Amino acid sequence: MLEQIKGRLVVSCQALENEPLHSAFIMARMALAAAEGGASGIRANSVADTEAIKQQVALPVIGLIKRDDPGSEVFITPTLREVEELVAAAPEMIALDATQRPRPGGETLAQLVAGIRARWPALLLMADIASVEEAVIAEQLGFDCVGTTLYGYTAQTKGHTLPESDFALLKAVLAAVAIPVIAEGNVDTPERAARCLALGAHAVVVGGAITRPQQITRRFTDAIRSPAV
C-alpha cells in the first residue's frame, strides 16, 4: 500500500454520528468520487464504512475506529479490540493513536503494538502522532509509517496547526525518522498539499476540505461576512 500512495493524495472519508453525512453508503459514494478525482487511497472510520468503501472502490484503505473512553483522551483505534474488529474488514493499513497520552485500561502503546504483532505480524500500522518525540517512539516500536494527524489536537499542541511556520513540525518529523511520513491535518488547499509533498512527505491526507461540505460552506460564509478590504 505504501508504494501505491507514494507522492499522491489520500482522501479521508469520515463523518461522525453527529454530522449530516454520517452513513456508510454516503462515505462509500464519497470514496468513489475521490477515486474519480484521482485519489490514491482512502482513510475510513469504522468497520461499516471500511467495508462499504472497499465494495465501492479498488483503492487501498487506511482503516480506523474512533471510540471514546471516559478514562482516556485516546480515541483513534485505542485498543486491541478495535484492531480485531477492523482486521475483519480487511483494510490495507490500520491507523492508531500513537501519542504518549494515557491509554484506556492503563495499557501502553508498546504493549498494544506487541499484541498486534503477535496476532497479525504482517499488518501495516500507521502511527497518528502529535510530536517529533512520538514519531521517533513509533518508529522504534515498529510502525510502518507515521502521520502528523494529531498535531494541534493534544493538550501539548493545542492551538497549533500543521501548516504554521511553513510546516515546521512536518520538517522536524521528516528529519527525525526514516520510515514514511504522511502529512495530515489542516491541509486544506491544493497548494498546501503540494507543499507537503515537496518537503518530502511520503503522501498527504486531506479530509474535511474535500469531504465535509459543512466545513467547506463555513469557509465561504465566513469569507463573505468578513470581506477583504
Positions of the model-derived regions?
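C-terminal alpha-helical cap/extension of soluble enzyme domains
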Residues: M1-L2, G7-A28, P163-V229
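Conserved hydrophobic beta-strand within the GNAT/NAT acetyltransferase core sheet
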Residues: A44, L125-A127, V181-G185
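Glycine-enriched alpha-helix->loop->beta-strand junction motifs that scaffold or abut catalytic
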Residues: G38, V57-V61, A89-M93, R119-A122, ...
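Glycine-rich phosphate-binding active-site loops on the catalytic face of alpha/beta enzymes
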Residues: Q14-L16, I65-P70, A89-R103, C145-K158, ...
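A short, structure-level motif marking secondary-structure boundaries and short turns
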Residues: L9, Q14-E17, A35-E36, R67-D68, ...
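Conserved N-terminal beta1-alpha1 strand-loop-helix module at the mouth
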Residues: M1-A88, L125, E133-C145, R225
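Active-site-adjacent beta->alpha loops and helix N-cap segments on the catalytic face
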Residues: P20-A24, R43-I62, E73-R81, A98-I116, ...
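P-loop/Walker A phosphate-binding loop and immediately adjacent motor/lid segment at beta-alpha junctions
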Residues: A110-Q111, R117-A122, I179, R225-A228
